Each structure stands twice: as C-alpha cells, then as structure tokens.
Amino acid sequence: MIRVFAVITAKPGKRDEVLAAARAVTPAVRAEQGCGEYQLVVDEADFGPAQAKLGPDVYAVIETWSDADALRAHGGAPHMKEFRRQTKDLIVSSAIHVLTPA
C-alpha cells in the first residue's frame, strides 16, 4: 500500500477555484483501479494552538493506492491531465509526498 500526502498551493485567492476543479474529478479518481482513498482537505478552522496550519491558499489531498503502478496510472489518467490543464495558471506549487508504512 502506498500513501500520498499532496500539498497544493494556489495563487492568492484562487484556492476555491482550484478546489472546485479538484472536486469535479474526484469521482473519476475514486473509480480508478487501485484507489483506496482520495480526500481533499483544508485546515480545521478552530482547532487551537497545537495546529500547524496549511494556510488560506493551500489544500491537501490524502490518498491511498494499492501499489506504485496504480499511482503512476493515476498521474496519467485523462481526468488528471484535464485537471492540470484547467488549473495550471492557478497553482503556485504542488508537493507530492509518496509514503509507505514505517
């Protein structure tokens, strides 16, 4: 099993627009072979001082994939290519952390 923690930083004020595009492809992603979890997340509003916030222009994606081949196929899926095309001018950076259980 492979886990992904992806951190996406949108241009100032554009996070909601990027999230809308991400939400639109989420059903197709969840239907992909090997996808166990695909969850878009943002900061909990009022957790308190222990929280390290991502920030107002940032969201993350928590993903679980059966194996590396499934994750690679996800990256090349037509809906992901379309997502990248739609958001290329709205995103400042993406940090994709590919993780395995310790």
Spans of features found by a protein language model:
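Absolute protein N-terminus
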Residues: 1-2, 102
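Short, well-ordered beta-strand segments in beta-rich or mixed alpha/beta enzyme
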Residues: 2-9, 39-75
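Short amphipathic alpha-helical segments
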Residues: 14-40, 78-84
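Glycine-rich beta-strand-turn "strand-cap" elements at beta-sheet edges
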Residues: 39-57, 82-102
